[in-house]
Amino acid sequence: MRRLLLERRAVGWPESAVAAVEAARAALAGGVDTPGLWELGVLSDGEVLESHRLLAEVEQELWPVLRLPTTVEGRDRALARYCLRDLLDGRLDPLAAAERVGFELCPYDDPDSPLRPFRAWLYRAEDQQEHGGGLTEELVAELRDLAAEVLAGPLS
């Protein structure tokens, strides 16, 4: 649920009620119990507008428990942690992960951001794809090493 609310605040996600309803059901199954979650958990897939309203209620109900970041930078770092964990767990394509972390979540005006190396990796990967026929295992391993290093260090 925390990730769903972080994504929602980042880009108005989820666009469909499906993700919100699934997250509510998972939270309820995990023992979280709020009136907003119960309402959200019984919505049909087509009730997108209602899901957005209920997500706002759930966010208010769970705010003290979830400790959501209050700044854009804090939110982006939290989302980067999720994204990098997904990469390391094999749930996210290396190029998609590098693009999300290096461009969407890395601040453009911070040359010292711990997320900036992902942008550099993506440039090299795109160059390799264009001239070398695809990503090599070594380059993907380098990205995974970088993700593990950043998760253990600046994003820990």
What are these regions (language model features)?
Residues 1-156:
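Acidic, Ser/Pro/Thr-rich low-complexity regulatory regions
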